[in-house]
Amino acid sequence: MRLEAATVESINPQEFISAVSPSLHSGNLEQALDYVRSRWSARQIVELLQYKCPEVRKVAALSLSVVGDRSAVAPLAVALHDVEPAVTDVAEHALWSIWFRIGKPAAVSLVKCGNNHMHHGNYDCAIEKFTQAIREDEDFAEAYNQRAIAYYLSERFEASIENCKLALTRMPQHFGAMSGMGHCHAHLEQWRQARHCYRLALAIHPRLEGIQTSLDQIDQLLRDNPCIS
C-alpha cells in the first residue's frame, strides 16, 4: 500500500489580505495577528512570501513574526533580498521574533531575564543567565548571540567572536551574529577579518543597517594602508 504525502492547502492571497488588512489599517495589529493564528499555519503563509503583490508579501512576513517557526527562517532569509524595502524590514523583524522564541521554554525565559540584566548594564549577570539558557538548550542560537552581545558590550571581544560563531553554527542565516563578529574584529583592529564578516552579513541581508557604511570605511582604510592586517 502506498501512502500519499500530506499536502498543505494553499491560501488565497486575496482572501488573506481582505481578512487581515482592515485590522492592520485600523491599527489593531494584535487582532489581525490573532486572526491569522486561528486560520492558517506557518507553512501556508510561507508560500505567500513569493507572491507578486508586495502588500501580500509584507503581511505574510508580518504574520510569520507571530506564527513562524524554524521552518520559516530560510524563506524569510530569502525575503531579506526582496526588491521592496518594506518587505525586507518586516522580514528582518520576523526573523528576530522567531529566533528569540524557538528555544525550549526554560531557555527562552532565561534569555529574557538576561536581556533585562543587559539593558541595565549588568553584563556579568546577563552572561550567567545566557549561559544557563545554553545549558537548558544547547541548540538555542539566540542564547549564544545574546551572550556574544553581552561580551561585546563589556569589551571582551574574543569571547564575543566565539559566541557569534556558536550562534552561526546553529543558525547560519543569523545576520546579527555575523555583523556582530565583524564589529568585534573591527574593535580589535583586525580589519580584513571585519571586512569578511561584513561582506557575509550583507550577503545574508543586503539592507542591514549601517553595515555597508562600515564596510566602505574599512575598504577605504585598506586601500590607503595596504600593509594593514
What are these regions (language model features)?
Residues 2-16, 35-50, 69-81, 104-111, ...:
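Amphipathic alpha-helical scaffolding segments comprising HEAT/armadillo-like alpha-solenoid repeats
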Residues 66, 97-101, 119, 153, ...:
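Register position in tetratricopeptide repeats
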